[in-house]
Amino acid sequence: MRYLWYSMYAFATALALYALFFRPPAKAPETNQPETVVIETWPEEVVEQDVDVQIALILDTSSSMDGLVEQARTQLWEMVSEMQLTADGRERTVAVSLYQYGNSRLQKGDGFIENLTPLTTDLDQVTVKLYSLRTSGGKEYAPMAIKRAVEELDWNSNDSVDKLIVIAGNEGFGQGPVSPAEAFQLAADNDIAVLPIFCANRGASQTALSSWKSAATLAGTDFESIDPDQEIAKLDSPYDAAILEKYRQLQETKVYAEGHGQSAYCQEAESYRERGVAVERAVVQSRQSHSKDLVNLYGSGRLESVPTAQLPAQLRAKSQKAQMDYLEEQNARQNELKQEIAELNAKREQHIDSRMKEIPAYRPSGRGSLGTSFKSGAKGVLKSY
């Protein structure tokens, strides 16, 4: 009997010890907190998305180049628009970097050369920097500017990406410590095409003209020359207001994580509406992929996870399914608006082409200007344009 009692005591003790030390973890209490969007990790810095075209625009900002700078301001969006579409109509994402050279306000030790923006798809940033440029006489080291752009910028090594340096100026091309041959060879070694554009204003010399023709030969391009003092006229169309309204609606569909909103330059760039670039800007921006827009990331399958606390207000209180449904709905709306803008722009371009033929005295935008030289020159040097 005593043996049975000891056996029962030992068994009870074993059960107690098991319950004490091997108890399964308690189930966490359920909460009503919404789940996080299920995708990977939101990066500390939102990286630029993949691009198809990279362009470094290098402008002479010496004292005689006010006209060149103004043409770049009014035609930047037009030039980018040209590069966004391939011959078969495929859309491409374009990144632009801006340099200035030949300005006495710049550091002599830097060769009177300054990088104003990295290669970026934030074209509003490029626009704002263009409007900040002020001309002033200085040494114009064009080959050195090309060399710096090749070495300093984050060029994509993928062969499928078109890479182009556009440099415009009016003084002798061979000035400075870097030879033209060295600059063009360095660009070629890095699979970067170079398009020299000579600014043939009243002060340009025959010696300078000859040096830019030689530069075009070294670059393997046709010689391009512009009149930097030509005033660029713009024709309105009956479709402009509708394009701007559709673009406004497109902007309303975008969703940003907390701290990752739209470009800090967006509002300032929009202030240049009165300068005649608003419609071109709307068309270009409707085609560009925006790496900070959660809707765009979702639609392209590149959306990464966003902690609930960083979600914008319209998503934070929703369940995970409701979040996905909302992004899907906005993505569909974006695609619809982009298509409508493309159709309106096709009608706009057709209308403007027709108007230009009806006005014999009208000098179309870009004839003898930076825009036209860029368009014709790019066709000659880029493999997929």
Question: Over which residues does each language-model region extend?
Answer:
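Acidic, polar low-complexity linker/tail segments
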Residues: 3-6, 15-56, 62-70, 85
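Von Willebrand factor
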Residues: 41, 48-113, 115-163, 165-166, 174, 203-209
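Acidic/histidine-rich, surface-exposed loop or edge segments in extracytoplasmic proteins
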Residues: 49-63, 124-132, 304-310, 316-320
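DG-centered beta-turn motif at the end of beta-strands
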Residues: 60, 72, 98, 146, ...
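Solvent-exposed loop/turn segments at secondary-structure junctions
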Residues: 61-66, 101-107, 135-138, 170-175, ...
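VWA/integrin I-like adhesion module and closely mimicked acidic/polar interface patches used
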Residues: 171-218, 238
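C-terminal "exit" segments of structured domains
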Residues: 219, 223-302, 328, 335-370
